[in-house]
């Protein structure tokens, strides 16, 4: 290959007559091609290369790695890796496998509660636990590869990481290697499996959405119980110390009354052998008011909140489905009206699936874009927009001022009257000067016209003064 290159170089230098030109071989080749291109004729180097490619024994092999940017290649590989990892994590087969393993692990945990089965199949149960833990660890690592900071924006991912982290610590710290804790953490993963089933996921989302309202109702019930516990200790503390001895005992008694289970046994303690009817009637009124407000109203508020949120979610889903149906019907009507356009309906396009499923390109990785940088960028955009708005206002005001100034005729009429009174000669000069000023104002901008007018006015005033002195 080197011999072929030397032969090309000698042939090219013999055609161009640049044998004595200094520089490296690559520089001389580039200079010869540039000179030939400037002269408007094909380069001898180009013709030589074309001839060489015509001869198989003298073809030049180009290494693709020498002309490829390694950084771009690495970015492409990283982007493709992230894309495939995202598809793997979202693939139904992977989700089904993970859910199946978690259900099997939950069944083994239930079977290990039996000491006989635990001892008999200890190795099998331990192997299943280790396999499930390994797959959970791989899921966390794949989530980090897909996007480390995006991983922490999902609450379920945080829960999975905490569970896996604690389960891994038990191999290094014996104090936390407690079977009850490990089994409880593994059972919590079943909640995430329920999110894969849409009806169950809808109910879980409704419950999570109702937590703030339920917390407010709980605070109200606790405040109500605290008030009635003070009343109970004050009124019945000496008569029934078993249930109203202090605040703690009274709160426990009222909690039993809210559950509506056991309040009859509590009220039976008010019926003593002496039959104090005042205490019995007072206790009956006390429990009636508390159970009516606390149990019937307070507990039902929880049901109302959850039911209302579920109804709102169902309505939102129905509205979205209705909008999709309306959009499909509108598309069908437009297709019937426009017979000239061979459009394909969206329902037909969705039904006809060919090849693999494709996801829209979401853009390249933004590894260097942090939240602080994004906030600063948004602030800069807002500042630029505000500056443009102020610039537009100032520009409009300047345009109005320019229009008003241009409407002034430079006091031409006043100057003509003054000059006509002085002399007819000065009047002709004024007429000439005013015409010149009009022409200049049309050709020049406003500032140059004002300067020219001032000069003409000074010259005309000097002429008038000289004429006035000569007359005297």
Curated annotation (Swiss-Prot):
The gene is CATSPER4. Its main location: membrane. PANTHER family: CATION CHANNEL SPERM-ASSOCIATED PROTEIN 4, ION_TRANS DOMAIN-CONTAINING PROTEIN. Component of the CatSper complex or CatSpermasome composed of the core pore-forming members CATSPER1, CATSPER2, CATSPER3 and CATSPER4 as well as auxiliary members CATSPERB, CATSPERG, CATSPERD, CATSPERE, CATSPERZ, C2CD6/CATSPERT, TMEM249, TMEM262 and EFCAB9. HSPA1 may be an additional auxiliary complex member. The core complex members CATSPER1, CATSPER2, CATSPER3 and CATSPER4 form a heterotetrameric channel. One of its GO terms (molecular function) is calcium-activated cation channel activity. This is Cation channel sperm-associated protein 4. It comes from Homo sapiens (Human). The keyword Ion transport applies. The chain crosses the membrane at residues 91-112, 123-149, 154-177, 181-199, 213-236, 280-307. Testis-specific. Belongs to the cation channel sperm-associated (TC 1.A.1.19) family. The CatSper calcium channel is indirectly activated by extracellular progesterone and prostaglandins following the sequence: progesterone > PGF1-alpha = PGE1 > PGA1 > PGE2 >> PGD2. The CatSper calcium channel is directly inhibited by endocannabinoid 2-arachidonoylglycerol (2AG). Indirect activation by progesterone takes place via the following mechanism: progesterone binds and activates the acylglycerol lipase ABHD2, which in turn mediates hydrolysis of 2AG inhibitor, relieving inhibition of the CatSper channel. Residues 247-258 dip into the membrane without crossing it. The keyword Calcium applies. One of its GO terms (cellular component) is acrosomal vesicle. GO terms for biological process: establishment of localization in cell; flagellated sperm motility; sodium ion transport; sperm capacitation. Residues 416-438 are annotated as: Disordered. Residues 113-122, 178-180, 237-246, 259-279 are extracellular. It catalyses: Ca(2+)(in) = Ca(2+)(out). It is found in: Cell projection, Cilium, Flagellum membrane. Pore-forming subunit of the CatSper complex, a sperm-specific voltage-gated calcium channel that plays a central role in calcium-dependent physiological responses essential for successful fertilization, such as sperm hyperactivation, acrosome reaction and chemotaxis towards the oocyte. It is a multi-pass membrane protein.
């Amino acid at each position: 290959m080197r011999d072929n290159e030397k032969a090309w170089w000698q042939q090219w230098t013999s055609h161009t007559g640049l044998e004595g030109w200094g520089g490296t071989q690559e520089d001389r080749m580039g200079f010869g091609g540039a000179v030939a291109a400037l002269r408007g004729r094909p380069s001898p180097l180009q013709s030589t290369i074309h001839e060489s490619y015509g001869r198989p024994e003298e073809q030049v092999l180009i290494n693709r790695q020498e002309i490829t940017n390694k950084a771009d290649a690495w970015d492409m590989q990283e982007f493709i890796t992230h894309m495939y990892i995202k598809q793997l994590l979202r693939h139904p087969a992977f989700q089904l496998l993970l859910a199946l393993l978690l259900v099997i692990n939950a069944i083994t945990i239930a079977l290990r509660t039996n000491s006989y089965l635990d001892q008999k199949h200890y190795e099998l149960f331990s192997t299943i636990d280790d396999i499930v833990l390994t797959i959970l660890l791989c899921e966390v690592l794949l989530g980090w590869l897909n996007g480390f900071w995006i991983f922490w924006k999902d609450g379920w991912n945080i829960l999975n990481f905490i569970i896996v982290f604690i389960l891994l610590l038990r191999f290094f710290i014996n104090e936390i290697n407690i079977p009850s804790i490990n089994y409880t953490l593994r059972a919590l993963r079943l909640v995430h499996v329920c999110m894969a089933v849409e009806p169950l996921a809808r109910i879980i989302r409704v419950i999570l959405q109702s937590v703030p309202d339920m917390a407010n109702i709980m605070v109200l019930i606790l405040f109500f119980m605290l008030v009635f516990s003070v009343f109970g200790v004050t009124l019945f503390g000496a008569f029934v110390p078993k249930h109203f001895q202090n605040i703690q005992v009274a709160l426990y008694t009222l909690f039993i009354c809210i559950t509506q289970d056991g309040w009859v046994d509590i009220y039976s303690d008010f019926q003593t052998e002496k039959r104090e009817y005042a205490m019995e009637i007072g206790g009956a009124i006390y429990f009636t008011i508390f159970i009516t407000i606390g149990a019937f109203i307070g507990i039902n508020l929880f049901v109302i909140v959850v039911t209302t949120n579920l109804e709102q979610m169902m309505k939102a889903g129905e509205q979205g489905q209705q909008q999709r149906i309306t959009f499909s019907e509108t598309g069908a009507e437009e297709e019937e009206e426009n017979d000239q356009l061979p459009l394909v309906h969206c329902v037909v396009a969705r039904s006809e699936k060919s090849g693999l499923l494709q996801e829209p390109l979401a853009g390249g990785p933004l590894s260097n874009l942090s939240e602080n940088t994004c906030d600063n960028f948004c602030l800069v955009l807002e500042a630029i927009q505000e500056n443009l708005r102020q610039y537009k206002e100032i520009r409009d005001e300047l345009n109005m001022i320019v229009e008003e100034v241009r409407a002034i005729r430079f006091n031409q009429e006043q100057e003509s009257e003054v000059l006509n009174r002085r002399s007819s000669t000065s009047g002709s000069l004024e007429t000439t000067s005013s015409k010149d000023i009009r022409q200049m104002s049309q050709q020049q901008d406003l500032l140059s016209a004002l300067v020219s007018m001032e000069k003409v006015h000074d010259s005309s005033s000097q002429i008038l003064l000289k004429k006035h002195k000569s007359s005297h």
